[in-house]
Amino acid sequence: PTGPADADILVTLTPGHQPTEQYVHDLRLKLGPRFAGVDFSFLPADIVSQILNFGLPSPIDIQVTGYSLQDNRRFANQLLRRIQMVPGTADLRIQQPFDQPHLRINVDRTKAQLAGFTQRDIATNLLISLSGSFQTSPTYWLNPKNGVSYSIATQTPQYRLDSLQGLENIPITGASGATPAILGSLASIQRDTGMALVSHYDIQPVIDIYGSVQRRDLGGVADDIKKIIDDSRKELPHGSEMVVRGQVLT
């Protein structure tokens, strides 16, 4: 998995099974209609395919690199739609989704300062409630009977943070002895979206378009994709680059 919304499903076939490609083809036809809004992709399962892909999850990898992420994202979406028209392509997707649900917390620094809190105080209290105190102040207890050290962490139970109201009720304390307050009195919470995965290549942000082939040779698909890429280069945002990697190059 590459993000919190991803999962791997491993399937082991019993002796005497049919060709694996047939199972993959049937699953591609059935999974999409039954699970709307979910993207499925089949990664190379055997070591030979993994080596031929140079460690990539798909034989086709089109990278769009550059610092203008929003422009690159729009370009990548347009390019993806064009490549989806190529016969024989499968599992086409953008590896870095931009629609991961986020909650944006905007702290009113004036209110926080008047109440005796700093931005660090609020961030630390949030981190303790959401991820546990082990992230900010690790604590250990040594069992004198067996000599083993155990980590001790405090964290707000999940059922107390299952709503925006629960998040707003997170207690905030400061190191300067300020009167404790709740998050809702010092900050506002807004629903937002953002990147679920941030990738870089040679320091620059990168967007990967991954794809596989189905019931067509990789060379034929690669030729069609190359024509689309050559035609799309004139639409590439200023300062960005587009590179093809993976088994498709061999």
Report each predicted region and the residues it spans.
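Extracytoplasmic/periplasmic membrane-proximal domains and adjacent transmembrane bundles
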Residues: 73-250
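Flexible hinge/switch segments at interdomain interfaces of large molecular machines
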Residues: 1-6, 41-59, 63, 93-100, ...
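Short, surface-exposed ligand-recognition loops at beta-strand->loop->(often short) alpha-helix junctions
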Residues: 17-18, 65-72
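Solvent-exposed, membrane-proximal periplasmic/extracellular interface segments of envelope transport
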Residues: 1-54, 110-136, 145-146
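Hydrophobic side chains in beta-strands
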Residues: 11, 42, 64, 154-156, ...
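Short aromatic/hydrophobic contact patches that present stacked aromatics
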Residues: 8-10, 61-63, 104, 208-210
